[in-house]
């Protein structure tokens, strides 16, 4: 009989899934780890994030492309009703996949990861992740549904933001939260002033503390700081908001 997998075996398997770029399998592997006792380690948390980010990312990109094609088709002088219906059905198929992925990780976060977390960086990580996946749901929602989902995202981001003040301004998790929270304000709540204020404060605080950066987090922190600055430049020059902001 085959020997049962240990936690270390599943971590190795998740890394193998990642190297092979088989992210659907990586999600399944991480779900097995999530069913085990105890908190996730920093390494396991990052693997969880990578797994879900890489199954949701291509579908978010696909939705944007299909939605753009749909808008162009509807904008023609003589729209083709059959083509528009084909596109609509396909877009809804992608939306169903997006919803399934988001609801899956949100359930894990709510029922397992958030309640188990005991330290500040883990709590910020999970609340940020909650905010992110509610934001992804809000991207293709409308009306009252969008308002409700955006409210859930805002609550999660606010919880993360409050706890993040316990972390150094240069901490990659705190910076990553500021980056994605500001994107939420800009793209979902259409609040460019609030987005710029949040991003600028996070960037300025990190600059002031730059000399305290550890070698271990230097690369991650400075990369996110660059993304914050890129977004600020984009948002100041692009009042129309057509371009997609950088996120972590």
UniProtKB/Swiss-Prot annotation:
Query: What does the UniProt record tell us about how this protein is modified after translation?
Result: Phosphorylated constitutively throughout the life cycle. Phosphorylation is very high in trophozoites and encysting cells of 12 hours. Phosphorylated during excystation. Phosphorylation promotes its binding to various target proteins and is critical for encystation process. Phosphorylation modification is not influenced by polyglycylation modification. Polyglycylated on a glutamate residue, resulting in polyglycine chain on the gamma-carboxyl group. Polyglycylated by the tubulin--tyrosine ligase-like protein GL50803_8456 (gTTLL3). The polyglycine chain is shortened by metallopeptidases of the M20 family, namely dipeptidases GL50803_15832 (gDIP1) and GL50803_8407 (gDIP2). The length of the polyglycine chain is developmental stage-dependent. In trophozoites, glycine residues range from 10 to 31, with the greatest occurrence of 21 residues.
Q: 5-glutamyl polyglycine is carried by which residues? A: 246
Q: Which GO terms describe its biological process?
A: actin cytoskeleton organization; establishment of cell polarity; MAPK cascade; positive regulation of cytoskeleton organization; protein homotetramerization; protein homotrimerization; protein localization; regulation of nucleus size
Q: Which domain of life is it from?
A: Eukaryota
Effect of changing residue 208 to A: reported as: Slightly decreased oligomerization
Which consequence is recorded for altering residue 183 to D? Loss of binding to difopein
Listed InterPro entries:
14-3-3, 14-3-3_CS, 14-3-3_dom_sf, 14-3-3_domain
Site (Interaction with phosphoserine): residue numbering on this chain: 53, 60
Record: residues binding O-phospho-L-serine = 135-136
- Protein purpose: Adapter protein implicated in the regulation of a large spectrum of both general and specialized signaling pathways. Binds to a large number of partners, usually by recognition of a phosphoserine or phosphothreonine motif. Binding generally results in the modulation of the activity of the binding partner.
Family statement drawn from the similarity comment of this UniProt entry = Belongs to the 14-3-3 family.
Name the UniProt record assigns to this protein = 14-3-3 protein
Naturally occurring in which organism (per UniProt): Giardia intestinalis (strain ATCC 50803 / WB clone C6)
């Amino acid at each position: 009989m085959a020997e049962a997998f240990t936690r270390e075996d599943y971590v190795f398997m998740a890394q193998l899934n990642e190297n092979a770029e088989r992210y659907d399998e990586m999600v399944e592997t991480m779900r097995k780890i999530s069913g085990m006792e105890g908190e996730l380690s920093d390494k396991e948390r990052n693997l969880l994030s990578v797994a879900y980010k890489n199954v949701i990312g291509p579908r978010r990109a696909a939705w944007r492309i299909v939605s753009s094609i749909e808008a162009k088709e509807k904008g023609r002088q003589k729209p083709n009703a059959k083509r528009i219906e084909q596109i609509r059905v396909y877009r809804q198929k992608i939306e169903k996949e997006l919803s399934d992925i988001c609801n899956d990780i949100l359930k894990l976060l709510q029922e397992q990861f958030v309640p188990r977390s005991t330290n500040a960086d883990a709590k910020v990580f999970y609340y940020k992740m909650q905010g992110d996946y509610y934001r992804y749901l809000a991207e293709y929602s409308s009306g009252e549904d969008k308002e409700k989902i955006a409210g859930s995202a805002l609550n999660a981001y606010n919880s993360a933001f409050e706890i993040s003040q316990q972390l150094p301004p240069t901490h990659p998790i705190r910076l990553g939260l500021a980056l994605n929270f500001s994107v939420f304000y800009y793209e979902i709540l259409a609040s460019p002033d609030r987005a710029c204020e949040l991003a600028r404060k996070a960037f300025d605080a990190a600059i002031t503390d730059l000399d305290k950066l550890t070698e271990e987090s230097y690369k991650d922190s400075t990369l996110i700081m660059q993304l914050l600055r890129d977004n600020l430049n984009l948002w100041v020059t692009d009042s129309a908001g057509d371009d997609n902001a950088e996120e972590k």
